[in-house]
Amino acid sequence: MHNYLDFEKPISDLEGKILELKKLAGEDESVNTSDEVARLEGRVRDAMMEIYSKLSPWQKTQVARHPSRPHFLDYAAELFTEFTPLAGDRNFANDDAIQAGLARFRGAPVAVIGQEKGNDTKSRIKHNFGSPRPEGYRKAVRVMEMADRFGLPLITLVDTAGAYPGVNAEERGQAEAIARSTEMCLNVKVPIVTVVIGEGGSGGAIAIATGNRVYMLEHSIYSVISPEGAASILWRDSTRAKEAASNMKITAEDLKSLGVIDGIIPEPVGGAHRDPQAVIGRTGTVIADALKELSGRNGDELRADRRQKYLNIGRNL
């Protein structure tokens, strides 16, 4: 059962008819619906191609937030072996919104950091809907330090609406934790490959996203603030989020043209949630190619190039 977005009504109507026909055929073996099902499946493919070829920025935002979209732990299970997560910041607590640890990627040791949103009510609460607290960013710093110490390439997967803005998080130094994580991400002398797999929201995303190579999935978004947040600030009206999204340059195509990211990873027609295995496989290939390209560079060069990359972004935008 799919969770349909509001602009997917033509698809939901067609797939509803397909389910009815299959149910009818299952109840009465004398009824042959295969030809009609095949015809409707063709119409579904055509409808998805048409709809997804011209998504608006707000529609892409909805796809990036789709509840069935694969999250960090889905990628970790498929891309990495021997993934050993670290827990805690050695100061206050553990934060499950940030998953970080050591693993093997195609046989080679790596360090891995990502935000996890969860996929049901219980896990979403556990992972705080992917909005990290200060402890999460301090845990990320721990893993970055380990990667730097042992010369491990660092892979980061970004998927957050933003860092948690609660009073307790602010009291424990949320801004400092984000700044420290960003600083460490810029300073390590190992290759960093970053992929925005869903939402890339504000400093909560950039804290683990200052990679030598940064990629976005086709229907992911990346911005300094959510469309709702921008609408609330600009017009005091969060219901104008659609209008804000259209003016914020948040899509992968926009950010590639602005030089913020290095490449776009295609998604299956209908979004990553339609075929998680395919998009995870493509992501793995892109990461492997990027690490191979960066492998011949020394640590000082990697760090200098990364710093220059983000200085250029600041100057050019």
UniProtKB/Swiss-Prot annotation:
Pfam families: ACCA (PF03255). One of its GO terms (molecular function) is acetyl-CoA carboxylase activity. It is found in: Cytoplasm. GO terms for biological process: fatty acid biosynthetic process; malonyl-CoA biosynthetic process. It catalyses: N(6)-carboxybiotinyl-L-lysyl-[protein] + acetyl-CoA = N(6)-biotinyl-L-lysyl-[protein] + malonyl-CoA. Pathway: Lipid metabolism; malonyl-CoA biosynthesis; malonyl-CoA from acetyl-CoA: step 1/1. The keyword Transit peptide does not apply. Its EC number is 2.1.3.15. HAMAP family: AcetylCoA_CT_alpha. Component of the acetyl coenzyme A carboxylase (ACC) complex. First, biotin carboxylase catalyzes the carboxylation of biotin on its carrier protein (BCCP) and then the CO(2) group is transferred by the carboxyltransferase to acetyl-CoA to form malonyl-CoA. NCBIfam families: accA, AccA_sub, PRK05724.1. This is Acetyl-coenzyme A carboxylase carboxyl transferase subunit alpha. The gene is accA.
